[in-house]
Amino acid sequence: MELKGVQPSNGSSNGSGNGATNAASTEKTDAEKPTAERTNWGNGLEFLMSCISVSVGLGNVWRFPFTAYENGGGAFLIPYIIVLFLIGKPMYYLEMIMGQFTSQGTVKIWSVVPGFVGVGYGQAFGTICIISYYSSLLALTLYYLFVSFQSELPWSYCRDEWTNCVNSRPQEYVDNLLTGVSLANESARNLSGIVANDETEKLQSSSELYFLNVVIKEKLDISDGVGDPDWKLTLALFVAWVVIFLVIMRGVKSSGKAAYFLALFPYVVLFVLLIRAVTLEGARDGILFFLEPQWGELLNPTVWKEAVVQCFFSLAVGSGPIIMFASYNRFDHGIYRDAMIVTTLDTLTSLLGGITIFAILGNLAHNLQIENIRDVVRSGTGLAFISYPDAISKFQAVPQLFSVLFFFMLFVLGIGSIVALQSTIVTIICDQFKGWKYWKVALTTSVCGFLMGLVYVTPGGQWILTLVDFYGGTYVVFILAIFELAGIVWVYGLQNFCDDIEFMCNRRVSLYWRVCWSFFTPVMMIIIFIYSMVTIEPIKYSELYFPEAANIAGWLLFAIGAAQFPLWGLWYISRHPQGTYWKSLKASLKPSDRWGPANPEIRREWVIFKNQKAAQRATQKDTSKLGFFWRKVANFCGSNK
């Protein structure tokens, strides 16, 4: 592929890669015009810490343990690690490369294949959906953090009006059990519920009733609306957004400094909780329950689907933060090392978080004299705000301290993730409108985020959270990630992409990356997405089905996100006609003049490098079929010839 728009003065050069110094043509295209220099990270460590803070987040401590438990326990680690190496790492590295190579955000990088610009806008839509409910989780976390400073944890005892309540205090739990009360094992919703011997009245733990009746004031039917926002949660939501704005207001200059704390502090707390958890009675049973493999689950396609969903959720690929962070790197930054560190650390943290959480749940089962730990595990929001508080309230020594540490850790993890997501949206807007002040865009989007989050702090908010996460987050991000990979590797071309990497990183791309990007990663993602669509079932909240109107709204949400891809593609074609529609379509699938490194000097060297590569391949061309075959194999495998 010979590049035009910026040509070496003599048409060729004997220099190579970054060392090329030939003068370029005096005529400048749009791609060469001076642009405002992009702010860079203070140092490479800030970038690494920022990536850790977004990838090592709530998904590791909150979502991974239950996902693993639901999908084969220890056996889930096998498909998860396979998915990590065949999908997670390749997608993570690819997004890092795209961001650093172009120094552009999620939308602007699509100068590589302009007809695919809708992928960037669709990912922005999915990111907005995730931001909208993620901030409400921070509000819940802040609420529990604040009330943990009381002399007695408020969820550890029953209110007078709760006639079906059992205190979460350790001794009183035992007293109730000894008088003939047994734990119900009917559904995930009743994880802490206890049923009397005559089973005429279901009893629930005070931690569950506190969350449902005091904190979220849960509605079991949203057909008549979701209700009004709770003022306490609204205040907590406001505080969360103030913190988010303060972190992102100066771009990477402020978020880069905060990243050290956001990335490292959770590990301090996690290790403190781990040490405390493994010393609790019953912890061993909980850990074994988490790690014990259910080998039969490996043949279940749903397990592999959940491994992919968890990998995407945990690493934050497909939604833009990795591209955005990498776009603020220096062009020659060593991202290969960072990609390997973050993806490996993410997996180890998930395992560490799972061991810690199930050690605590094992202690909870021990205190309740329950043999099957399955009965104390709850999915979704309930795991963080019912099971964990219930277990912490039974700590014999200073439960308030461990409660404060735990919820502060969750808050920091959540801030690290949402800061990256919010910065992605701000970067997209600032890339599009160069003259706009970053802090003003950050303030405006933060206000919008707060207003969107109000619906989630209503009595029916958990219903909306489940709906938006399912339709607007998971599936929108997943399908657009497939188009993202296809656009870069199949449309722009694997060889072109690998040449760009070689120029930027000064190293050939190994066979592992080439095989994953061109075959394993896209094929696995397509198969899993099709399977997910074929086997999709109506979603439920707390064992209750959503109203039909809610499901229609959910599918509409998915359609809006997915439709960004074709609609923006058609928009580009209509704005750049090339005579016939077919010619316009073909032109939209070729790189625009703006594709390439943002720095004009580096761009000129890159054009020389690419033209040299094209010339080398032309001279190596063999007319025989066998020679042609071996040349293609050599190029695919990364041969230096």
Curated annotation (Swiss-Prot):
SUPFAM superfamilies: SNF-like (SSF161070). GO terms for cellular component: membrane; plasma membrane. This is Sodium-dependent nutrient amino acid transporter 1. It is a multi-pass membrane protein. Belongs to the sodium:neurotransmitter symporter (SNF) (TC 2.A.22) family. One of its GO terms (biological process) is sodium ion transmembrane transport. Residues 1-38 are annotated as: Disordered. Residues 9-26 have a biased composition (Low complexity). Unusual broad substrate spectrum amino acid:sodium cotransporter that promotes absorption of the D isomers of essential amino acids. Neutral amino acids are the preferred substrates, especially methionine and phenylalanine. Its main location: membrane. In larvae, weak specific expression in the anterior midgut just proximal to the gastric caeca reproductive rudiments, common ureters of the Malpighian tubules, and distal swollen portion of the anterior pair of Malpighian tubules. Expression is also seen in the imaginal disks of the head; brain hemispheres and the ventral ganglion. Stronger expression in the posterior midgut. Glycans are attached at residues 185, 190. The lineage of its organism: Eukaryota, Metazoa, Ecdysozoa, Arthropoda, Hexapoda. The chain crosses the membrane at residues 41-61, 74-94, 111-131, 229-249, 258-278, 307-327, 341-361, 401-421, 447-467, 474-494, 516-536, 552-572. GO terms for molecular function: amino acid:monoatomic cation symporter activity; amino acid:sodium symporter activity; D-amino acid transmembrane transporter activity; L-amino acid transmembrane transporter activity; neurotransmitter transmembrane transporter activity; neutral L-amino acid transmembrane transporter activity. Keywords: Amino-acid transport, Glycoprotein, Ion transport, Membrane, Sodium, Sodium transport, Symport, Transmembrane, Transmembrane helix, Transport. It is found in: Membrane. It holds the Pfam family SNF. Residues 1-40 are cytoplasmic. It comes from Drosophila melanogaster (Fruit fly). Residues 27-36 have a biased composition (Basic and acidic residues).
